[in-house]
Structures are given as structure tokens and as C-alpha cells.
Design a protein with these regions (language model features):
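Local cysteine-cluster metal-coordination motifs and their immediate loop/turn environment
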Residues: 44-66, 89-110
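Conserved hydrophobic helix-helix packing surfaces used for dimerization/oligomerization
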Residues: 146-148, 169, 284, 437
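Feature captures the FAD/FMN-dependent oxidoreductase FAD-binding
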Residues: 140, 145-149, 197-246, 354-367, ...
Length: 490
């Protein structure tokens, strides 16, 4: 441990963001660079706890106190070695992870937690700058061929791990560029796409084969893949959006959030000349209070929307934890994103009733009613508040209320993978009902976080490697703690 009283001596600091009035004019990342001296101070705040709950909070099991100590001592090779032992892509999670590790930080009981996400990002970027992250192809090949379908974070992680195990990996992507949700779902002001391109170029050097513009069932059939490859990983995400199912949701101008966000990312990436869904000069309603809804706010502000309102069915969370939500649980508190800072009205405890439209079939308004949440029989339910129903202007609406499961496009069935009633595939140890076909990420577990997708890709790779070779030398999440501890101790 570098500084025994660092958590007392230094306060939590995070990067300064660019002025909202300036940054809404571009799609660049919003945060300014963070100085090396300040980063060392933030790493020094880690208490090197006897029981580091941050491990448990991180789906990847990142060995956080150890890499914090390495950063404090400016041992960048050690820091990236520790971080990469559990996380294939710290440059992604260091930018877009909601940091459940920080919510579990012991310091967070009565102080601000350690800025773990910031430290993680800076380890990755420093390692790239110093040439510490470079192509590392496997020394031997097994002669086995693996197909990975879907190039989101789960597919990329599975491909990376399986390639390191010595298998010949081909990653199939239906879109023009690699990245899946990272590429087409997350705005550039949160994750600029050169970050993905840099990693993909590295994986290509290491031997991973990328086949873009390749949609299973069109460009190539599932049967052909099953015949050509020794095993398959399906990792195409949970892309089926949850519908609002209210009257008038067929009007022009009512869209699922990913239609809007995906097209905008295609514009920035040079795949489209302009976004066919424009928020310029429009009264925008965002239905759903999560991160995807927040991304719609930020993008609409950059389009020049006349007004933006975000609606949330649930009640407004408290600013601080309350007694029924103690540490180390995920804090159910009010969160203000960078997009909220740029401008939007937020309304909580509100129910959408009906879209209204004109004779041309265009949406013009949305009827709302306030609701009151009450506990009945140990369960929370809501009631409409009489006299609060009203219709507000709405020229453009984005539905961002989550996803129900994998896209219903017949992909699972084509590969012989049976599904459950909730549309998720049946699986045991990441293996589908077709022994040759494995599952990873949101496609297997349902909608989740990028960090969970990477974890899923890693765990799936171990089970697939065992299927092909009988045993696997790839690290499992739990085993990696002991491996890294031994390396550090040695």
C-alpha cells in the first residue's frame, strides 16, 4: 500500500468536463485530460482493505487494490498486467462502466469512494502510450476453428480469449463495422470509436479474423458455419426492445431509442450522410429514465431540439442512500448524467396514456397522468392521481424502457439452440442445447452492462475451450484472484 493515510489526506477528484454550452456543438468525449499527479493522489485513496468489497462489486473480479498501488508507485507495467489479467478491454470499461466497484468501495461507507473507473481508464491509456499494450499472438495453434457471431463486448471478449488459447477465431458481424452496442448504441460523446478501432487492429494482428457485413441466414447459413467450425459462440445481444403498447404508438415520430442512436453513430462514422430521424427544432419526449434515455437527451441536444422532457414511471430517488438501501448495495439515488447537465426536464411518477397525432399520421402530443406509489400487501403499486391528466406537445418520442431478450430473427433456432418462455436461450455452463453452440452476454443473461458482457465472453471462452480440448488454461473469474495475487507476491 502506497499511502497509509491517502484516504484521509486526499479528496475524491474526477476529470473536469467541458462546458455544456460548448460540448453540445460536437460529439467528442466530454472530459478533459486528468493530470498524472492527481491520478496518483486518487490511487493513494485506496485503503487496501482486508476484505476489498470492490472485488465483489466488479462483475469481472478486477483486482483493484493491487492496481491502485501500482499506479501510486507509477509501475505502469505492473498496473496493466494486473488489470489485463481480468479485463480484456479496460479502455472501454474505464469510459462507460457505471462502476459497481465504486458502489461497493469500503471507503464509500462514510466518504466518497475511490475513483476506480478513472484510474482504470488512465492505466489503459498510459499503457498504450508507453507501448505496453501490443499484439501478442499465441505461440501455438490448436488446429481448432471457432466462429463467434456478434462483435459486441461479449463477442469481442470471447474471441480475444479463444484466440489466446490458440484456436483460429472468425468473428462474424452483420453491420459494416465491428463493435455491436459499443459501436452503434453508445454515443461518441461517451465513447469515441477510434478507441474500438485501436483494439480491433490489435486483435487482427494477433490473428482474429473479422468478417463484417455478414448476416447469418443471408450472407451465410447457420448450417454452413456448423459444418465449417468446431464450435460456435452466439453473442448478438438482447436487441428486442420492450414496447410501450399504448394507443397511438404507430404515429410517425415515435421511435425506439436505438433507431435514433444507431443512425447518429452511423452518421459520425461516415456510414450515413445524415440521420433520417432529426430532433432539430422539435419537442422531444424521452420515455424511460435510464442510460439509454439519457443518451437520447444528449444526442437531441446536439441536434438542436426545441425542448426535451424525460419521463420516468418510478418515483424520484433520494439524493442520499436511505436506511433500506445500505452499503454495499447498489445506491438507489438520484443520478444526474452529463446529458442531463446539457438540458432536459425530468418528470418522475408519470404514466404515459396515449399519443395523439394529425391527419398526416404524425405525432403531435402525448397524454400523461401523475401517479402515486403505494405499498399494498408487501408490494409497491401505483394509482393515477385524479385531475392530473394532460396532453403535452410531442413532435418526436423515443421509447427507452429496456429490452425483452434476443432479436426474434430465428438465429437461435437456426443453430439448434432451444429457448425458454422468456425468449432467452436455455443454457448450462454457457452451453446451449446444441453442444457445439455456446452463448455469451446479453443474449444469454438478458439486458445488462458492458462489464457483464465482457465477463460473460471470458467465462464462455473457458467452457468452450474445455469442450474442444478437455481442459483449459484460460483464467476463470474466481481463479484469477489467486493467480494475480501470486504474481504480485512474487
Amino acid at each position: 500500500m502506497g499511502a497509509k493515510e491517502g484516504f484521509i489526506q486526499f479528496k475524491r477528484e474526477t476529470p473536469v468536463s467541458r462546458d455544456p454550452r460548448e460540448r453540445v456543438n460536437d460529439y467528442r468525449e466530454i472530459y478533459e485530460p486528468f493530470s498524472g499527479e492527481k491520478l496518483n493522489e486518487q490511487a493513494a485513496r485506496c485503503m487496501d482493505c482486508g476484505v476489498p468489497f470492490c472485488h465483489n462489486g466488479c462483475p469481472l473480479g478486477n483486482v483493484i487494490p493491487e492496481f491502485n498501488d501500482a499506479v501510486y508507485n507509477q509501475e505502469w507495467g505492473e498496473a496493466i498486467s494486473i488489470l489485463r489479467s481480468t479485463n480484456n478491454f479496460p479502455e472501454f470499461t474505464g469510459r462507460i462502466c457505471p462502476a459497481p466497484c465504486e458502489a461497493s468501495c469500503v471507503l464509500g461507507i462514510n466518504k466518497d469512494p475511490v475513483a476506480i473507473e478513472l484510474i482504470e481508464k488512465n492505466i489503459a491509456e498510459k499503457a498504450y502510450d508507453l507501448g505496453l499494450i501490443k499484439a501478442n499472438p499465441p505461440e501455438k495453434r490448436t488446429g481448432k476453428k471457432v466462429a463467434v457471431i456478434g462483435s459486441g463486448p461479449a463477442g469481442l471478449a470471447a474471441a480475444d480469449q479463444l484466440n489466446q488459447a490458440g484456436h483460429e477465431v472468425t468473428l462474424f458481424e452483420k453491420d459494416a463495422k465491428v463493435g455491436g452496442l459499443l459501436r452503434y448504441g453508445i454515443p461518441d460523446f461517451k465513447l469515441e470509436k477510434w478507441v474500438i478501432d485501436r483494439r480491433v487492429a490489435l486483435m487482427q494482428e494477433e490473428g482474429v479474423i473479422f468478417s463484417t457485413n455478414t448476416e447469418i441466414g443471408h450472407s451465410i447459413q447457420a448450417d454452413e458455419i456448423l459444418k465449417t467450425f468446431d464450435a460456435v459462440v452466439l453473442s448478438t445481444g438482447a436487441a428486442h426492445p420492450r414496447a410501450l403498447n399504448i394507443k397511438g404508438d404507430h404515429y410517425k415520430g415515435v421511435h425506439f431509442a436505438m433507431e435514433f442512436l444507431g443512425k447518429q453513430n452511423q452518421v459520425i462514422g461516415g456510414e450515413l450522410a445524415e440521420n433520417p430521424i432529426s430532433a432539430e427544432g422539435k419537442h422531444v419526449i424521452v420515455i424511460g429514465g435510464g442510460d439509454t434515455g439519457s443518451d437520447c437527451i444528449g444526442t437531441s441536444n446536439r441536434h438542436g431540439a426545441a425542448s426535451i422532457t424525460q419521463l420516468e414511471l418510478l418515483p424520484k430517488p433520494p439524493k442520499q442512500r436511505n436506511f433500506i438501501n445500505p452499503w454495499p448495495e447498489w445506491p438507489m439515488t438520484l443520478k444526474t448524467s452529463s446529458s442531463h447537465e446539457e438540458g432536459a426536464e425530468r418528470i418522475f411518477s408519470i404514466l404515459t396514456k396515449e399519443f395523439t397525432g394529425n391527419e398526416m399520421g404524425e405525432v403531435t402530443g402525448l397524454t400523461l397522468v401523475d401517479i402515486e406509489w403505494k405499498e399494498k400487501g408487501g408490494r409497491m403499486s401505483f394509482e393515477e392521481i385524479p385531475g392530473t391528466e394532460r396532453t403535452v406537445p410531442c413532435d418526436l418520442a423515443f421509447i427507452a424502457i429496456g429490452y425483452t431478450g434476443p432479436a426474434q430473427n430465428g438465429l437461435l433456432q437456426a443453430f439448434g439452440a432451444e429457448t425458454m418462455e422468456n425468449s432467452l436461450p436455455k443454457s448450462k455452463n454457457y452451453q446451449s442445447t446444441n453442444p457445439k453452440v455456446f452463448l455469451a452476454g446479453d443474449m444469454r443473461r438478458g439486458q445488462s452492462l458492458v462489464v457483464w458482457a465482457i465477463s460473460e465472453g471470458r467465462e464462455t471462452a473457458v467452457k468452450l475451450d474445455e469442450y474442444l480440448m478437455g481442459t483449459s488454461s484460460l483464467p476463470m473469474k474466481d481463479e484469477s484472484f489467486y493467480q494475480v495475487d501470486e504474481q504480485v507476491a512474487g
